[in-house]
């Protein structure tokens, strides 16, 4: 792990000897700050006249403010993470230093976990800024510390999931621009799938006039497709976590998503070594 930490320190040094680290932190603080202000003002308006918004009483703070806000903060990583991961491997290839990295006495796991760790440390720094924003109103609310902690864990897991996918895409690209655009494109595709997946009806859309066997098969295929469309998006499992509802399946989905793309990153590096 000491070698992985050495890689992480190298990457962190690169982030903060160039403007990218400061830009990312500043941009995240700005965008989450604007979202925090807008969501809190909207909650205040709803609390003053809940009947106008179909609430019988003052709306629940966790459901109407905390959960949407934390999910929003996690989704911002869809735009931020490509800026972090675009340089992790793509810049190495562009500068010609990736061969030096691979010939250095480092194992693949040292390289992958080191680069992933550097990106995740930056994500944790962004979440620290987020905590400062939440603490401004925490004392005036009745949010339990455990609920808030679980919501922040959800944001962290979203960041890790985005980061692992971006790391894999960076391995495949030759320059930073291609890596950033490709990463955002994949993230946006996940988001669109989830957006339209939530609108899909639950019932079998196959025409009633179809033969029973075909209709049954179409129903199975549609059910699988709808399940994937609603569960695949990275933000799909964060909403309940941000409300303090702990479901092991939600945590496991993020762990498996991140592990899957880290595994693909290992395989991509291994394939590159064989080609070399």
Question: What does each of the following model-derived ranges do?
Answer:
Residues 1-25:
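Aromatic- and glycine-rich beta-strand/loop motifs that create alpha-glucan
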Residues 19-45, 75-80, 185-189, 260:
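Hydrophobic alpha-helical transmembrane segments of multi-pass membrane transport/permease proteins
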Residues 32-37, 56-70, 113-178, 246:
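Secretory targeting signals
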Residues 39-63, 179, 185-276:
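Terminal transmembrane helical anchor/hairpin motif
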Residues 65-91, 126:
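Long, hydrophobic alpha-helical segments
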Residues 81-85, 133, 164-165, 264-265:
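Hydrophobic/aromatic residues in alpha-helical transmembrane segments
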Residues 82-102, 116:
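Transmembrane helix boundary and interhelical loop/hinge segments in multi-pass membrane proteins
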